[in-house]
Curated annotation (Swiss-Prot):
It comes from Leontopithecus rosalia. It comes from the Eukaryota. This is Homeobox protein MSX-1. Keywords: Developmental protein, DNA-binding, Homeobox, Isopeptide bond, Nucleus, Repressor, Transcription, Transcription regulation, Ubl conjugation. Residues 1-51, 63-111, 127-157 are annotated as: Disordered. There is a cross-link at K9, K127 (Glycyl lysine isopeptide (Lys-Gly) (interchain with G-Cter in SUMO)). GO terms for molecular function: DNA-binding transcription factor activity, RNA polymerase II-specific; RNA polymerase II transcription regulatory region sequence-specific DNA binding; transcription cis-regulatory region binding.
């Protein structure tokens, strides 16, 4: 508590003269007193060790100047693991091999280093691969990330035509009935009511069955007749001559054309024949001339 007035007194004696006329202290004694006051003030302040400030300039410079500290700590941890003889395989937490209830401690940084991997047994480095059950990470097994299994598309069901509920089942005709119906149709395609009743009773059929059979047989005969007429039309239809396309060749094809050109150039075949001027076939330009005359008129 006496340092403050002492400091004031020192300041007055150091930088100025005292107010009174008494003799002041000497400069050497004033400097010593100021140094003692500064030391007391520094001792009163709380001192912070550099270790408590990891981001201070001193701590950063110390880490930068000593790069071998981490390597020495890693080597020490590796040697401790080798001495203990408890090399843990990859992917196994440290507490799983020991007591199951013990809390798992964080892995050292040198656990996956080159030296640690070389010291591990081969069984720990090589995983057993089974084609039946491939290993998957937990995030791949979750349905959120793994794609859904492919669904097998069943073939579409064949939709059949639905018949009427009151439809009567089809009655098959016997061979004798079919022969009699066909013979009667060749004789007469249209039957009267009396003829149909008599004919149906002789075949043990109803009049409706005979009537429907004759209708279907007439439709079939009509289709066959139209097909025959179409064939006859195609057979009787003449092929378009080459003159329709602007070209006309004599009968015999290209071979006859070549022979005619050779005969017109060298005359008739035989010895001692003079060469004659080539004469074009008569019908070669007939179509072109007619086409031009038609447009000129």
């Amino acid at each position: 508590m006496t340092s403050l007035p002492l400091g004031v007194k020192v300041e007055d004696s150091a930088f100025g003269k005292p107010a009174g006329g008494g003799s002041g202290q000497s400069p050497s004694s004033a400097a010593a007193t100021a140094a003692a006051v500064g030391a007391d003030e520094e001792g009163a302040k709380p001192k912070v060790s550099p270790s408590l400030l990891p981001f201070s300039v001193e701590a950063l410079m110390a880490d930068h100047r000593k790069p071998g500290a981490k390597e020495s700590s890693l080597a020490a941890s590796e040697s401790a693991q080798a001495a203990g003889g408890l090399a843990q395989p990859l992917g196994v937490p440290p507490g799983s091999l020991g007591a199951p209830d013990a809390p798992s401690s964080p892995r050292p940084l040198g656990h996956f280093s080159v030296g640690g991997l070389l010291k591990l047994p081969e069984d720990a480095l090589v995983k057993a691969e089974s084609p039946e059950k491939p290993e998957r990470t937990p995030w791949m097994q979750s349905p959120r990330f793994s794609p859904p299994p492919a669904r097998r598309l069943s073939p579409p069901a064949c939709t059949l035509r639905k018949h009427k509920t009151n439809r009567k089942p089809r009655t098959p005709f016997t061979t004798a009935q079919l022969l009699a119906l066909e013979r009667k149709f060749r004789q007469k395609q249209y039957l009267s009511i009396a003829e149909r009743a008599e004919f149906s009773s002789s075949l043990s059929l109803t009049e409706t069955q005979v009537k429907i059979w004759f209708q279907n047989r007439r439709a079939k005969a009509k289709r066959l007749q139209e097909a025959e007429l179409e064939k006859l039309k195609m057979a009787a239809k003449p092929m378009l001559p080459p003159a329709a396309f602007g070209l006309s060749f004599p009968l015999g094809g290209p071979a006859a054309v070549a022979a005619a050109a050779g005969a017109s150039l060298y005359g008739a075949s035989g010895p001692f024949q003079r060469a004659a001027l080539p004469v074009a076939p008569v019908g070669l330009y007939t179509a072109h001339v007619g086409y031009s005359m038609y447009h000129l008129t």
